[in-house]
């Protein structure tokens, strides 16, 4: 195995998805350091050799090492994979900026938009770090538990640097379980991963109200159209939204109850408040925050996104689920 393949990786973020990606990398034979912002919890992970809070009974591979010191976590590697909630993405970049050297390369698997602005995370990264570091994004239909268990999974990888993309594809890709597709459309890959969370809330609301499979499928289909329109306004490639980071992630998130966003929507459709639903889920529901950012971005771009708009009205303006459904179903007749 060449040095390119065996170079170590640091994963920043020890939640379910960050841990799962660290497990997948380590299982593939690469020295992997996993860092989290709470040293006492990282000490438990190091002792138990698993993340029982998020991925119980899935043992860490020998190549996975817990690192609670951020300085060391950055100093030991060239390649950094950030897997934190979108609302702290900028904070993590600000933390690591003084620790970076010219050789570092940054990738993230965070799905979302910048809080209160709707900006793509690539824009945030370039604003904080400048343009001297190769950047990449990993996105697609991946539930953390299945990935950590080694079940077959496929994902998309896009980068500003073709060499970085090629090397990370070869490092992550595992012919037995984890397939990585390269995509040169960073805008589309980021956008698909963020907006699908909002549509998944809508699908959950629909199912929670008992509207059935026909309505769910219509929401997914029209949701994809909304994502594609927004992507076109930002210069994304329309083909991206038919791939892993678009349709793939959208279908997965809208149809399986492993999705926090879908479960959140289900509870809303059943009459629970947003606060009650989030408390019951007990983890970050990215789509709750992404809804506001997606709505802001659509307004900025002048793009019509009725599903996103109605979910925004429900979450942030007090509109109830029945009125949301009535508004969507009562829209004027139009061509597809």
Swiss-Prot record:
Is Oxidoreductase set as a keyword in this record? yes
Say which domain of life the source belongs to.
Bacteria
Protein's cellular compartments: Cytoplasm
Which residues are involved in binding NADPH? Answer: 16-17, 37, 111, 144, 260, 284, 286
- Looking at the UniProt entry, the stretches that span the membrane are none
Q: Which Pfam families match?
A: NAD_Gly3P_dh_C (PF07479), NAD_Gly3P_dh_N (PF01210)
Q: Which SUPFAM superfamilies match?
A: 6-phosphogluconate dehydrogenase C-terminal domain-like, NAD(P)-binding Rossmann-fold domains
What catalytic reaction does the record list?
Answer: sn-glycerol 3-phosphate + NAD(+) = dihydroxyacetone phosphate + NADH + H(+); sn-glycerol 3-phosphate + NADP(+) = dihydroxyacetone phosphate + NADPH + H(+)
Task: Write out the entry's keywords from A to Z.
Answer: Cytoplasm, Lipid biosynthesis, Lipid metabolism, NAD, NADP, Nucleotide-binding, Oxidoreductase, Phospholipid biosynthesis, Phospholipid metabolism
Keyword Oxidoreductase tagged: yes
Task: Tell me the Gene Ontology biological-process terms attached to this UniProt entry.
Answer: carbohydrate metabolic process; glycerol-3-phosphate biosynthetic process; glycerol-3-phosphate catabolic process; glycerophospholipid biosynthetic process
Q: Which pathway does the UniProt entry assign to this protein?
A: Membrane lipid metabolism; glycerophospholipid metabolism
Query: Which GO molecular function annotations are given, in alphabetical order?
Result: glycerol-3-phosphate dehydrogenase [NAD(P)+] activity; NAD binding
Which residues are noted in the entry as sn-glycerol 3-phosphate-binding? 111, 140, 142, 196, 249, 259-261
Please name the Gene3D superfamilies in this protein's record.
N-(1-d-carboxylethyl)-l-norvaline Dehydrogenase, domain 2, NAD(P)-binding Rossmann-like Domain
User: What does the sequence similarity comment in the record state about its family?
Assistant: Belongs to the NAD-dependent glycerol-3-phosphate dehydrogenase family.
Function comment: Catalyzes the reduction of the glycolytic intermediate dihydroxyacetone phosphate (DHAP) to sn-glycerol 3-phosphate (G3P), the key precursor for phospholipid synthesis.
Name of this chain's protein: Glycerol-3-phosphate dehydrogenase [NAD(P)+]
Species whose genome carries this gene = Actinobacillus pleuropneumoniae serotype 3 (strain JL03)
């Amino acid at each position: 195995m060449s040095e390119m393949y065996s170079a170590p990786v640091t994963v920043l973020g020890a939640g379910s998805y960050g841990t799962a990606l660290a497990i997948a990398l380590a299982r593939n034979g690469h020295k992997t350091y996993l860092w989290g912002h709470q040293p006492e919890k990282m000490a438990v992970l190091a002792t138990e050799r698993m993340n029982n809070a998020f991925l119980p009974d899935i043992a860490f591979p020998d190549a996975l090492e817990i690192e609670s010191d951020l300085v060391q976590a950055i100093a030991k590697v060239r390649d950094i994979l950030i897997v934190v909630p979108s609302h702290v993405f900028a904070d993590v970049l600000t933390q690591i900026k003084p620790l970076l050297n010219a050789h570092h390369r940054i990738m993230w698997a965070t799905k979302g938009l910048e809080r209160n602005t709707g900006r793509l995370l690539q824009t945030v990264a370039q604003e904080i770090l400048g343009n001297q570091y190769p950047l990449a994004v990993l996105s697609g239909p991946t539930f953390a538990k299945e990935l950590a268990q080694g079940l077959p999974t496929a994902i998309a990888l896009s980068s500003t640097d073709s060499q970085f993309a090629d090397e990370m594809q070869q490092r992550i890709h595992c012919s037995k379980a984890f397939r990585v597709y390269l995509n040169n459309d960073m805008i589309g890959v980021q956008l698909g991963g963020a907006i699908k969370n909002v549509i998944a809330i809508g699908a959950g609301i629909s199912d929670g109200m008992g509207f059935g499979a026909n309505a769910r499928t219509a929401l997914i289909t029209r949701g994809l159209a909304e994502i594609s329109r927004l992507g076109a306004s930002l210069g994304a490639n329309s083909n991206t939204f038919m791939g892993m980071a678009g349709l793939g992630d959208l279908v997965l998130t809208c149809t399986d109850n492993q999705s926090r966003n879908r479960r959140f929507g289900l509870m809303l459709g059943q009459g629970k408040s947003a606060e009650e639903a989030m408390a019951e889920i007990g983890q970050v529901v990215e789509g709750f925050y992404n809804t506001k950012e997606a709505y802001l971005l659509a307004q900025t771009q002048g793009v019509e996104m009725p599903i996103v708009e109605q979910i925004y009205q429900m979450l942030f303006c007090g509109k109830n689920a029945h009125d949301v459904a009535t508004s969507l179903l009562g829209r004027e007749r139009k061509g597809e």
